[in-house]
Amino acid sequence: MPSVIVSAVRTPVGKFGSALRGCSAAELGAVAIRQAVARAGIVPAEPDYVVLGHVLQAGTGQVAARQAAIAAGIPREVPAISLNNVCLSSLAAIGYADAMIRAGELRTEVAGGMESMTN
């Protein structure tokens, strides 16, 4: 099955210790997921899987991708994983999603990356 991108969203770009300092990576990821799902015209329960790249994972708690997904309204039954591959995490996540869709394992996925360089 071919894989297509139906929505693309990014979070604001900030400066270290500036306006976004109070936002965790999972909170920023949730904003992007919520908007991507809305712009794609799907309901939050439609994705089969959430896979997000996230490099600076120390201190973020367990599976920040799952935290972001739940905060974005994705049901708890939808699995989520965080990938850590320095400077390539979001592309690795998108590649993983693409491979799973082309293999026929999944139909709809949320894939991308999230980061907070301040906290």
What are these regions (language model features)?
Residues 1-2, 15-46, 61-119:
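Acyl-thioester C-C bond-transforming condensing/cleaving domain
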Residues 9-13:
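Short polar catalytic/cofactor-binding loops
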Residues 50-53:
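Short glycine-rich or small-residue beta-strand-to-loop segments that form or flank ligand, phosphate
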